[in-house]
């Protein structure tokens, strides 16, 4: 029987992976946090904090640091992957030789596969097979607030109901971290990926000084785009009204803790994409997801005008003013 005291291994020592590891550890699970950089892991072990990505949050005593992947995976049945989407396929290749029949895989990576636009579940099943219980963790949770223990809520979608309920019980905390179960893995994955694209648009709008009305319109029409794409792929429309859909979208579009929103703000103020990303200094998932989301929408025959215009700006040289003109000048239509 899996309990909150059962060990878990988190793969990925960035800000979000560290925050989740802290959350598990505080909730009673012996937690092993793996990172690919031995120097970084050694530094965290000494300082008992992730000074590089999540400074001033001290690790719980039962949070263990590990730079050896094989050893990290030996400790636990449940393996939680928290790496950028562009590194997701690579980490699957690395863990494959160390997987055992009892392992269960969860990921909190938000994005689509680079160059294909495929859902990460598809990538997992292609590379590792379909024999493992799978789950995705997604929702409106900034790493810093999560690590500080501030109230948060998130969605857990799994391909096995028993797995979902067991995993929910080990992370759900009555003191302020709520976990909602959902069986719609497609919808939960899409919500987490495409919201980053819309957040860039909201940032661009605010950077250009368009105000709260325009931002709210982008959020509202953005959830409509995400829902249309989700329906075309068999997702449940209700998913997009939940934590991993509207919840994550609103958070990412309205708070400057969001890298994607800050990236958009800089674009709206006239910086180019390369300079904006350098200023942020961490991965901007929405930059890469924009291209994949646009190409996925084209393949599915789904109209996604906000996504299309952001794609035109990031990859085809269109400027912010012309993007705004294109969106505002669209033909009248029903809601």
From Swiss-Prot:
Q: Which InterPro entries match?
A: 6-PGluconate_DH-like_C_sf, 6PGD_dom2, G3P_DH_NAD-dep, G3P_DH_NAD-dep_C, G3P_DH_NAD-dep_N, NAD(P)-bd_dom_sf
Class in the EC hierarchy, top level: oxidoreductase
Regions crossing the membrane: none
PROSITE patterns noted in UniProt:
NAD_G3PDH (PS00957)
Where does the secretion signal sit in this chain? Answer: none
- The scientific name of the source species is Haemophilus influenzae (strain PittEE)
Metabolic or biological pathway: Membrane lipid metabolism; glycerophospholipid metabolism
Q: What positions constitute the catalytic site?
A: 195 (proton acceptor)
GO terms (molecular function) for this protein are:
glycerol-3-phosphate dehydrogenase [NAD(P)+] activity; NAD binding
Where, by residue number, does sn-glycerol 3-phosphate bind?
110, 139, 141, 195, 248, 258-260
Detail which positions bind NADPH.
15-16, 36, 110, 143, 259, 283, 285
Q: Which Pfam families match?
A: NAD_Gly3P_dh_C, NAD_Gly3P_dh_N
One of this protein's GO BP terms? Answer: glycerol-3-phosphate catabolic process
Q: Where in the cell is it found?
A: Cytoplasm
| Role of this protein | Catalyzes the reduction of the glycolytic intermediate dihydroxyacetone phosphate (DHAP) to sn-glycerol 3-phosphate (G3P), the key precursor for phospholipid synthesis.
Q: Does the keyword Cell wall biogenesis/degradation apply?
A: no
Q: What is this protein called?
A: Glycerol-3-phosphate dehydrogenase [NAD(P)+]
Q: Name one GO cellular component term.
A: cytosol
Q: Which reaction does it catalyse?
A: sn-glycerol 3-phosphate + NAD(+) = dihydroxyacetone phosphate + NADH + H(+); sn-glycerol 3-phosphate + NADP(+) = dihydroxyacetone phosphate + NADPH + H(+)
């Amino acid at each position: 029987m899996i309990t909150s005291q059962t060990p878990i291994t988190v793969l990925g020592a960035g800000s979000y992976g560290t925050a989740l590891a802290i959350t598990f550890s505080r909730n009673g699970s012996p937690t092993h946090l793996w990172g690919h950089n031995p120097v970084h892991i050694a530094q965290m072990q000494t300082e008992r904090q992730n000074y590089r990505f999540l400074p001033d949050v001290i690790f719980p005593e039962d949070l263990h640091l590990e730079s050896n992947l094989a050893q990290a995976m030996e400790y636990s049945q449940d393996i939680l992957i928290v790496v950028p989407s562009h590194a997701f396929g690579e980490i699957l290749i690395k863990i494959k030789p160390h997987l055992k029949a009892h392992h269960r895989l969860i990921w909190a990576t938000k994005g689509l596969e680079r160059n294909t636009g495929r859902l990460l579940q598809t990538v997992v099943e292609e590379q590792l097979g379909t024999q493992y219980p799978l789950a995705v963790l997604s929702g409106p949770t900034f790493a810093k607030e999560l690590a500080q223990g501030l109230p948060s809520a998130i969605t857990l979608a799994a391909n096995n109901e028993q797995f979902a309920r067991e995993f929910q019980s080990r992370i759900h905390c009555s003191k302020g971290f709520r976990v909602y179960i959902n069986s719609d893995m497609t919808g939960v994955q899409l919500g987490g990926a495409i919201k980053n694209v819309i957040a860039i648009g909201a940032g661009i709008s605010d950077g250009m000084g368009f105000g709260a009305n325009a931002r709210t319109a982008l959020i509202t029409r953005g959830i409509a785009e995400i829902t249309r794409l989700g329906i075309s792929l068999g997702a449940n429309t209700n998913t997009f009204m939940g934590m991993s859909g509207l919840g994550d979208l609103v958070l990412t579009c309205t708070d400057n803790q969001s890298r994607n929103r800050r990236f958009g703000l800089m674009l709206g103020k006239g910086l180019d994409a390369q300079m904006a990303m350098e200023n942020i200094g961490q991965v901007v998932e929405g930059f890469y997801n924009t291209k994949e989301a646009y190409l996925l929408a084209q393949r599915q025959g789904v109209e996604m005008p906000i996504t299309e215009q952001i794609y035109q700006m990031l990859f085809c040289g269109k400027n912010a003013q012309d993007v705004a003109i294109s969106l505002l000048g669209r033909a009248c239509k029903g809601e």
